[in-house]
Every structure is written in C-alpha cells, then in structure tokens.
Curated annotation (Swiss-Prot):
Alphabetized UniProt keyword annotations: Glycoprotein, Proteoglycan, Signal
Species for this entry: Caenorhabditis briggsae
Annotated segments matching region Disordered: 460-680
Low complexity bias: start-end ranges: 484-500, 633-647, 654-669
Designated name of the protein: Chondroitin proteoglycan 4
Amino acid sequence: MLRVNLLILLCFVPFSLNNPLPTLPPDTANAYLRSFLPWWPNNTDFSLRAAPTPSESENSTEAVLLGAEYENGTDSTTGNQEDLDPATLRVQALPDSPLDALSPENAPKSFVSESMNHHDGNFIINFDEMGECPRDCSNDLREALGIVLQDMSHVERYHRICEKYSNASTCVNEDGRCDKDDRGMFEMMTSGLHYMCVEQELAFNATIKCIDDEAGLVQSECDAQCQTKNLFMNWMMRTAFQDTIQQGVNGIVGAATGTNANPLAFLQGAEGAAGGTPTGWADMLATVEQRPPSPQDAQQGFENFRQFTNDLCRIGDCMLDCIRSKFNTRCEGSAGTLLSEVFVRPIAASQNKLSILRPVLGSFMPEQCNYLTNNADLKKHRIDSTMDEELKRMYAEKMAKEIRDRNAQDELLSNLVPLDENGVPLPRALPELKSVDSPLDVSVKTLDQLILDMYSKNETKKAETTKKSYPNTTTVAPKNDDQAANTTAETTKTTSANITHVETTTLGNPKTEEVLSDVSLDTSGNNSTVADSGEGSAEGAGEGTEEDAEYSGSGNESTTEEEYSGSEEVSATDEGHPLAADESNEGLLTGSGEPAEEASGTGNSSVEGSGSGLDSLRSYIETSGEASGGAPGEASGEASGEASGEVSGEEEFSGYSGESPGENESSGEVPLTTTLHELY
C-alpha cells in the first residue's frame, strides 16, 4: 500500500508545480551539452526553460530560418511587415551538427530543388516520382539495391536478390495498373537479374559457392591489374574540395583527441557571422545560384567529365575482362562468362531500346566508352549463344542426374530395415517379403526343438554308399535266405566230386550252416558215382565247373546287390575251388573283361559274367545226364587234362580273388566270410 501511495505522489507532484524544470545558467547548460557533444561550441547563449518566452532576437532568427513573415507582438514601435529575400538569408547563431538534416521545411527554397523534397534517402532513383505501378512494385527492387551494399556472403546475397526480383516481377506482371511500357522498362532494367535468377538459375546454383570462395582473391588481382585504387586516389587529389575534406578530417581527429572542441567549424565559415564573404557549406549553397558559370568553368567541367568518364569506362572494360578470365579459370570454366553477361545484358537491352540516342551519346562519349553504345564493341563481353544453350543443357542434365541419384538413394534408404532400441530389425519394415524360418531364430523354435529336428532328419536318411557303375555287369534279382541256401547246397553237391576233403566254416546265416553240413556228409557217396561215369562224366564235370563258375558269378553278383541293400552276406573264398573264387570276386570279374580272361585256366574253359544262376544249374544237370552215356575211354584222358587245366586256372583265378574282400570293404559294411581250405 505504501508503494502505491508513493507512486501516486510522484505522478501528481510535477503537475502541482508551475515550473518543475529549474532554469539553468548558460554555462551549466553548455557544460552539460559538451559532456555529451564534444563539438558543442563554448560561447552559445542557450538555456533550459520550462515555458520559454520568445525574445526579439529569437523571433528574428525563426523568421530567417522559416523564410516567412513574422510580426513581433512585443514591439509596439514597428508594426510594418518586412519582405525577406531568401537569397540573402544565412544560417547564423546556431551550432551546426552533423546529425542535422537540411529539410525542405526550414531550408531556403532557393537552393533546394523540388525534386529533392521527397528524396527518401535515395538521390539516384526517385521511386516516389514514378507512376503507381512502378512505385508500388519497386519496393523489392529498392531492397535488392540495399542488399548489394550489405556485408554478407555472395551465396546469401545471390539468393536474397533473386527472391526480391521474383517478387517485383510478379507484381509488375500481375498488377493491372502496369501497362506495356512499364513492363518493357522493367524488363530492360532487370534483364541481368532475369538472366541470373531465371535463365541460368541452375548454372549459378552450381557455381555460386565457388564464386564466393574465389571472390576476394579475384577482386584483389583485378584491382591490381586495372589500377582502380590509383585512379580514385588521383581523382580525390584533383577535386576542388581537397582542403575542405582535409580540414574536416583534422577537426574530427582533434575532437577525438580533445585538442579541438569544434571540429566542424570549417562548415560555418570564419566570416559568415560578420556578414563577410561566405566560406561555409551553407554559404556556398546559398550563393551558388547568384554566381553564373563562366565559359571557362563550363569548358573545364566538360573536360573533367570526359576525363572521368573515360577513366571509368576503361576500368569497367578492364574489370569485365579480368573477372571473366579469372573466374573461368577457377570455377568450372564458365562462371566468369556468366557474371559478365549479368553485368552487360542491361546495357545491351538499353542499346536496343534507345537506338535513336546512339549518335547523340557517341558525339561526346570518349572512345573508351564505345562498348556502351556500340553492340560490336560490347559483344566481346557477352556470352555466345551456342555456349549459353550448351550450359543450359549441361546443367539441366546434371540436375536431372542428381535428382535420379537422390531418388534412388531415398528408395534404398526406405527399403532398409529399421532397428528397434535393442538393435533387432523390425519385421514390419518389409511387409512384401515372406519370413523365412532360420535355425538361429530362437524366438520361433527352442533349442530342444532344433536338436530334435536335426536328429529326425538324420534318421530318415539312411547311410548310403556310392554305387560303382560296371558297364558289363548283369544284375540278378536278389534271393531270399531259403533260395540262397538251397542254391549253395546244390552247387556244393555237384562240384564236390573233385574234392577229397572239404572243411566248411560257416559264419552268419544258420540255415546255410545246416545245408552245408548235410552236403559234407553226402560227399563220399558222390565220389564213387563220379569215378564210374567215364568220359562223358569227366567232360560233364569240366563243363559243370565252367557252368559253376558262371553260376557262382551270378550268385556273387546277387550277393553283392544284397550287400548294397543292407542284408547279410555269405561269401566263400578258396584258393583251389572255382566256387570260392567266383563267389568272392564276381564284382571285379564282371566289372572288366581282363580278370575274366585270367580266370579261365585253359583256352577251352571261359568264365562269363552274365546269365542267370538257375539257368546255369539246369544246363549243368542236362549236360551231366547226356554225358553219362558217352565213351569211357575219352573220359579218362580228357578228364585228367581238363582237370589239371581247371585246377591251374582256378588257382590263378583264386590269386586274383584276394582283392574281393577289399572291394567289399569299400562298401562300408563288414561281410561275413565262409572260408574253404584243404586243396586236393
């Protein structure tokens, strides 16, 4: 509450006093002002008053400044109005400040032109004097001109200028108040911006970064080559305001160091206050129209204009050549040509529009400025039409390629599987792909299920051995255990006539053991029968031996086929018996022709690796029956000869039969072997 009362009191105190601001003496006021304004003069009659009362001197001063008639109400002696001549007015008794602007309201109309009344800080182009269309649409162009002078990178400046130009162009084209002439003038003045921002936008987008990087070095090299600094320094030395500028610099430096309290005293003039010759800026402006120019001054001014214009045109020509060559060398071979076209295209457009003024301009323009009025001289700074079209095509294709690559990259990135917070791929990222079961996917199957699946697959696949292909082998259908046992027994009974003693060892099938034991008991009875049979019997025995070899080979082949099927096997091996040799080595004998020839002990006996075992047995029985009726004389000789050959052949065959177990071992199974010994 106390704070609120204090605030109300402070608000009403100023209004309760007649003179809240005390009157300060001039010395105090001047000292106060000099603390903030070092250039404020010492001897200035100035005071702060709450309600100032105008005096006669002040009234006369206001009359001088405003250039109007003022009647002094306090003076009763003079009531006549005086006509003031603006040409004789001078600014007196007021300190000058660099912050004071010479406004049209308080300045004499004699030296302020009407066109400068609303200059708005721009003395080059008065946008306010334009028509409605150019004036309203020129705001963006005005901002674009300001952007050129701002401190920023060329990349940012390029984009901002193009943005402003686009807005101004849209305004001119869409505003109904803009007629054809307005649009034509706008296009002529902004043709360089149109070329940079529209026609060759892709080229400038690709080269503006390089231009920004190399601009500082190129500018320094071109300044040294064209001697621009020397030219401007020369013209500064030749100006008529050299002394005035020097005095101003000295005064500012003195004010900064405290040695000079009024650095701008040279603007007021030493004799201005006393009514002498005007030497200050205001005095010079006030009397400029009173001194008509002499012919010598006009001639000198024209010569100065031609010389200055000649130097400017020379520097412009040199800078265009230098910029074009330097930037072409550093930035893709075309940046300098593009920049040169931006600068000279408005000049070329103005030459086409103002072709009538060419002779007039050429009459007083120096030779160095011929490229401003002559298309032939300007052509060296312009881009060739073929190169212009080629640059458009090249950068258009480059942009299209970048767009395709960017789209392909975006498509590739979109197809990548995003990961969750644990780094696991999200399955919803690929909805078009079907999920595939993986043994490593523990989220689908447990470890026990994986192990069971692996062993179940191994059980279904039996251990299979590689079957060797024998081109000359005739396959016989496998027999069951009873048929195999009967066949072995019958063959043993038939061939046991030539064997004195047989020791049988049976491994494996018990049925085969019983049959073989019965065959050994009947051997003695069969020996006497075979001895009385004669020649036919002997020949039959020999032929039977061959047939036995054929049958035993077929039987062995059947046994081999049974081995591959995983069944039990019975093989007989005997060095002197053809049955043992045939049964144990049929795989090798029938696989190639050479072992078969070695197995035939004589030329009359041959072992064939084909035929059925049952057919061989039937043919043997029929042959033995027919041979029983033959001559007994031939039996003894032929039997002995053939028997000896048979024995030797069978021995040779039995030597080769030793390789049969190895062949059986290669099948991956252990065969059951029945061995017969005791040769006769």
